[in-house]
Structure formats: structure tokens, C-alpha cells
């Protein structure tokens, strides 16, 4: 048993490659990728009990993001394009895969997210972007995850 280091859980975004196929590319140079479950609660108090009861009825997962803008980064370029062009609907949806490299066999979960930009340029030293990825459906466990380039890109099944 041991502690899991943050850099052992890495994220990949599906970005269209030059051939038009989706390439799951590592999300690098992010200063924040915080997952929030956003539980949907149902609370009530029954007349015959002196306390409240709360049940979880669902979830509204999000990932809050922030990054320092780097040149020639395909994931950042894609997010910046969505932000600058104010894309909406399906044009602002991407698949994100979270890979856990702390296990003996890497495990991966994928989910579609809407990219919800929030702010940009709020640092005096470097140009930054931030926002949220909001769940657009259920998460799916991937049967396998492989990489031929030290986890710069991945293939999933």
C-alpha cells in the first residue's frame, strides 16, 4: 500500500489529427485538472424523525482546468480555438480519457465533455486559460490502454 502520486493519473483529449481521425493526445502543461463529482442530492425530513435524510440521486461531473498557453500544443490549440471562436453544441464536445498509471496494468476511463471556457489572460507573467469540462454522458471503462510513445498519445479499446 502506498500513496498515489498526482502525475500517475494523466489525461488525454481526443483531437482530430491531420488525417481526420481522432488522436488521444496527452493534456500537458495544465496547472489544474480538478475533478468534481457535483452530487445531486435529495434531502428531506420525515415528521416522525428529528433529523434530515439525504440520498445521492445522480452526479454532474466536471473537470476544472487551467493552463499556461504553450505554442504547438495540439490539445491547448483545440481548446483555444473553441474559446476564441465561441463554438457551441457538438462543436465544443471532446472525449477525455483519464489513465491511471499507478496500477500494475494501466486503467482508463473515458467520457465526453462539453468545453466551457471561463477566463483567459489573468496572469501578468504568462498567458493563461481556464474553464470547465462538463460531463456530456456516462463514463465508460476502457478494456485496454496502450501507448507506443511513452504516453504522449494512447490507443484505447
Show where each model-derived region lies.
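Mixed-charge, glycine-accented linear interaction segment located at domain edges/termini
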Residues: 110-157
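Solvent-exposed edge beta-strands and adjacent loop segments
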Residues: 1-70, 114-125
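Intrinsic disorder/low-complexity signal
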Residues: 17, 40, 47, 67, ...
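Beta-strand secondary-structure signal
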Residues: 62-66, 95, 130-134
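Generic preference for hydrophobic/aromatic residues in regular secondary structure cores
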Residues: 10-13, 30-31, 91-98, 115, ...
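Short, acidic/charged, Gly/Pro-enriched secondary-structure junctions
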Residues: 76-109
Amino acid at each position: 500500500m502506498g500513496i498515489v502520486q498526482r502525475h500517475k493519473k494523466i489525461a488525454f483529449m481526443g483531437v482530430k489529427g491531420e488525417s481526420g481521425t481522432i488522436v488521444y493526445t496527452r493534456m500537458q502543461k495544465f496547472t489544474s485538472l480538478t475533478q468534481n463529482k457535483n452530487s445531486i442530492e435529495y434531502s428531506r425530513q420525515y415528521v416522525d424523525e428529528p433529523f434530515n435524510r439525504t440520498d445521492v440521486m445522480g452526479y454532474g461531473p466536471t473537470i476544472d482546468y487551467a493552463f499556461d498557453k504553450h505554442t504547438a500544443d495540439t490539445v491547448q490549440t483545440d481548446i483555444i480555438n473553441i474559446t476564441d471562436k465561441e463554438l457551441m453544441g457538438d462543436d465544443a464536445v471532446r472525449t477525455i480519457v483519464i489513465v491511471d498509471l499507478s496500477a500494475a496494468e494501466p486503467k482508463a476511463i473515458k467520457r465526453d465533455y462539453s468545453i466551457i471556457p471561463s477566463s483567459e489572460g489573468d496572469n501578468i507573467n504568462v498567458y493563461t486559460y481556464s474553464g470547465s469540462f462538463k460531463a456530456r454522458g456516462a463514463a465508460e471503462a476502457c478494456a485496454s490502454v496502450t501507448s507506443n510513445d511513452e504516453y504522449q498519445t494512447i490507443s484505447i479499446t
